[in-house]
């Protein structure tokens, strides 16, 4: 009986190791983020031609992330930038449906905005995290994916946004 119990405990310990989440740290020079699984891959790194980084969760339809640095007027709040983006950019996406704005806190604080749209005849969802770095800089983490897939990885998108850290 003791051997059976010891074997069961050993099995639990070893199986816990197999289910541990592998996290990879991505370093963009100005900031770092943690990618919650090896499925997340970098597809574009910031350079002279592209000032933003892009990532996919296996496939663009499963989850796509673009990180942009937004330089704003002094005193502009993340919610102000979110409202401006909704009014000037997102509203013109095909099939756009505005979602809700929520406060967000991690290493940097800000707001999130969710919305729905149509892309190549597929229903999509978008979620943007606006994170305030200082009174003139806001980072926008723009996630998009299929409407039935992106909400399933909300814990991963939140983890990525919470892990966003300036150097």
Give the positions of each predicted feature.
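Positively charged n-region of N-terminal signal peptides that target proteins for export
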Residues: 1-4
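Bacterial N-terminal signal peptides
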Residues: 6-16
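N-terminal "mature-domain start" segment
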Residues: 21-50
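Soluble non-cytosolic domains of exported or imported proteins
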Residues: 30, 76, 80, 147, ...
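Solvent-exposed, polar/charged alpha-helical surfaces in well-ordered, non-transmembrane soluble domains
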Residues: 33, 83-87, 155-162
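Surface-exposed amphipathic alpha-helical segments
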Residues: 38-40, 138-167
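Conserved polar/disulfide-associated segments of primarily extracytoplasmic proteins
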Residues: 45-139
